[in-house]
From Swiss-Prot:
It is found in: Cytoplasm. NAD(+) binds at residues 52-53, 130, 176-178, 196, 201, 242-243, 267-271, 277-278, 326, 496. PANTHER family: UROCANATE HYDRATASE. Catalyzes the conversion of urocanate to 4-imidazolone-5-propionate. This is Urocanate hydratase. Pathway: Amino-acid degradation; L-histidine degradation into L-glutamate; N-formimidoyl-L-glutamate from L-histidine: step 2/3. GO terms for biological process: L-histidine catabolic process to glutamate and formamide; L-histidine catabolic process to glutamate and formate. InterPro entries: Urocanase, Urocanase-like, Urocanase_C, Urocanase_central_sf, Urocanase_CS, Urocanase_N, Urocanase_Rossmann-like, Urocanase_sf. It comes from Rhizobium rhizogenes (strain K84 / ATCC BAA-868). Its EC number is 4.2.1.49. Its main location: cytoplasm. It catalyses: 4-imidazolone-5-propanoate = trans-urocanate + H2O. GO terms for molecular function: urocanate hydratase activity. HAMAP family: HutU (MF_00577).
Amino acid sequence: MTNPRHNIREIRSPRGPELNAKSWMTEAPLRMLMNNLDPDVAENPNELVVYGGIGRAARTWEDFDRIAATLKTLTEEETLLVQSGKPVGVFRTHKDAPRVLIANSNLVPHWATWDHFNELDKKGLAMYGQMTAGSWIYIGTQGIVQGTYETFVEAGRQHYNGSLKGKWILTGGLGGMGGAQPLAAVMAGACCLAVESDETRIDFRLRTRYVDEKATSLDEALAMIDKWTKAGEAKSVGLLGNAAEIFPELVKRMKAGGPRPDIVTDQTSAHDPLNGYLPLGWTVAEHKIKRESDPKAVEAAARASMKMHVEAMVAFWDAGVPTLDYGNNIRQVAKEEGFENAFAFPGFVPAYIRPLFCRGIGPFRWAALSGDPEDIYKTDAKVKELTPGNTHLHNWLDMARERIAFQGLPARICWVGLGDRERLGLAFNEMVKNGELKAPVVIGRDHLDSGSVASPNRETEAMKDGSDAVSDWPLLNALLNTASGATWVSLHHGGGVGMGFSQHSGMVICADGTDDAARRIERVLWNDPATGVMRHADAGYDIALDCAKDKGLRLPGILGN
């Protein structure tokens, strides 16, 4: 039987100013869908997998072709509906409505489990969209670099007097998200030892300059770390190995007086025990075969390995090493496997990122549909021009230009908040209008943002008012972005932490240089981050309440206005 998800063809987004669709409002989602499957972008494009275990861009190759064909013929008064990667309908709407509305992997809560999802997936009735895979705004590993960088910098501020020079970070996973860690660490001034069980992943990160060196033994990797930290250099090494073995071994060596990491985290694809985590002692080839032949055994073995992995992380924490969960739900699995103390160490959002979320600051990103890197460099300069006092942001943009290799369509990410997003979006649109840019740009974000996600083990962990699991907020965010006129809007379940543990929404808007686009940008790029300020103000955070007042938000049930 032919696998409808396998195809050896190579997909790359069109470049330049020529349209393949009827307008830029439909050309933009077409190009970004194709860009998600570019071999320089996606982790496993032949299987439609973009990143994050089995995060896909379309349900099957037939669905991909139908989506692409529909986008090419869609008018400016029609909207395409996509249900878990399948184009299910086209309906008459209006010019300011989204051109695409996407819902991926959503399940009624009682049935929101990996077992039930995997049954549906096997029958061809569902698709796991992760966050930006099924919403067509993945820009490669750069997409999470700055968030990881901000986390490491803040950890340095809190634990090491503001400097990570001569320090080293231990982590696991070099997939589409985890691959950001070594580069983010180096940008923050630290060394990084990243454990990865699939050698092709290490090689991919070497090729795209996200990791500096490769090691095949722990001793070899530690020798590199020792040399670099003593010299005050910031460099990274990808170690071929299994984190469930390497982490406990490092604990053992640390307790015997050996090397001690300065920060410990992990970004393996532990959110998906069947597809995302290699059990201890298994080969990659064996894992691939048994996922099909004996999925229950794979999951059981992976979960047991994760427990060992987390036990080691808690041992580091107990020894005084700053340790953080980076949002892959590995603590939850370890607890379910009987390790009661799995949540001893915090998640990265409550530990380091939440004050940014309170001001609507999060992962603002844009991509140049022209395919020309110069368009991104020009927008970088515009960001600096419009944020003259923000030296931290300027330093980030300089480092990003120097260190980050573009994957697929040239793109940039920078964390900015309420007010700045709208100003930058309008400026980019004006640059398109004036011919400064060779083609329109799309502006979007990760679903990991201040107002667009409910994820009690990640973004909304330990909320001040206990509202961690309330998922009205991402639903309201998606509805408001739809009403505001985003070019495409998505609502997903299970991204980052897996089935049953998150709901989240995304939006993308196309800046094509028109006055219509400017009006939509003004609404969308104000309202979207404003929902994050609203959500955190409702939870009682003073920073968010002050921001809401300062920005003049009307929040009747919160501010009484």
